[in-house]
Amino acid sequence: MRKLITLAMLALTSIAWGADTNEAPVGFGLWNSAHLKEVGDRLEKELGDKRIVYETLGTYKGHSVYLVLRGKTAPAEFHETESDLQIGVRGKATFVIGGELVNPQKLPRKQQQGSSIKGGAKFPVGPGDIIHVPVAVPHVLLIEPNKPYMYILVKLDEEPRNDPPK
């Protein structure tokens, strides 16, 4: 009898260990290509004559992930505490980094904007290109008229947002 109980317990333990444990841990995020295409197509419909539209893909402690579509060149920017990682998805643009902000203005969340950048290095960017923007370095994406540029943006050490999530 003792052998039977031991075997039964071993069998139940094996079944329990073999149970489906495919639950992702808290904080895990996966945005597959089909989802990114769906969101990207929707953003293209929303863009119209706007400068930028985006969708927040995930928000985590200290960083967030966005899918961004730029339709026009925005003001140059500078983040006092955040760094950015950008991965090109669709279209082409020119990325300018370094130099000095022209007419800088302080913004909330420890950021600054300027009308342009004086100096700076220019790089053509497109799908698959990865850009790392260090903390406290001016940068801007130059967008050609009627040629939007889409990219995944990971904001690292992001200052808390006060606006409602999209």
Segments predicted by a language model, with ranges:
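A short, N-terminal "cap"/entry segment at the start of jelly-roll beta-barrel domains
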Residues: 17-78, 164-166
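A short beta-strand-loop-beta hairpin characteristic of the jelly-roll/cupin
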Residues: 92-127
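A generic "binding-loop/recognition-motif" signal
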Residues: 71, 81, 137-138, 147
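Positively charged n-region of N-terminal signal peptides that target proteins for export
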Residues: 1-4
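Bacterial N-terminal signal peptides
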Residues: 6-15
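Conserved short histidine dyad/triad with adjacent acidic residue
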Residues: 62-84, 89-92, 96-102
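Conserved metal-binding segment of the jelly-roll/cupin
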Residues: 124-145
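A short hydrophobic beta-strand segment most commonly corresponding to one strand
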Residues: 146-164
